[in-house]
Amino acid sequence: MHVLSPSPGDCIFIPACTIHALGAGLVVAEIQQASDCTFRLYDWDRVDASGSSRPLHIEQALEVIDYDRGPVDPIRTESIGADRIETLVQCDKFRLMRLSKPESYELDLSTCNVIAVPQGTATLETAHGQIELGMGDSA
């Protein structure tokens, strides 16, 4: 087992078929390809809205786990000043970028974009006006 103690702002890319769990006290943005498939090995004794235990998928998970995958670690990026644009993850399903106080950035509108604001504020300018986003907002 590989245990991490993440710090605020860390990015950790966990490829599909990698067993993982979150510890107490974490707030995360889980970014992934669109999928209706999650195999739970354990569910911390949580229950659904009706009070029933959620199903576990042990046999299915054991069939797809990548047993050769090594430990994952936070992605370390080089700080290039206050205004920076970093590609944190680039895989065949999505790209994750971190924009830190850029004066402006034009989105590629030929693909789906999600803007999340983990701290501070952001202003989106569109043909229809401006949208103000605050900490915790996404669009």
Residue spans of the language-model regions?
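A generic structural signal for well-ordered coil/turn residues at beta-strand boundaries
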Residues: 8, 16, 25, 90-95, ...
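Short acidic-glycine-tyrosine-enriched beta hairpin
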Residues: 2-12, 126-139
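Ligand-binding loop in jelly-roll beta-barrel domains
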Residues: 17-38, 130, 134
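C-terminal amphipathic alpha-helical segment
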Residues: 39-109
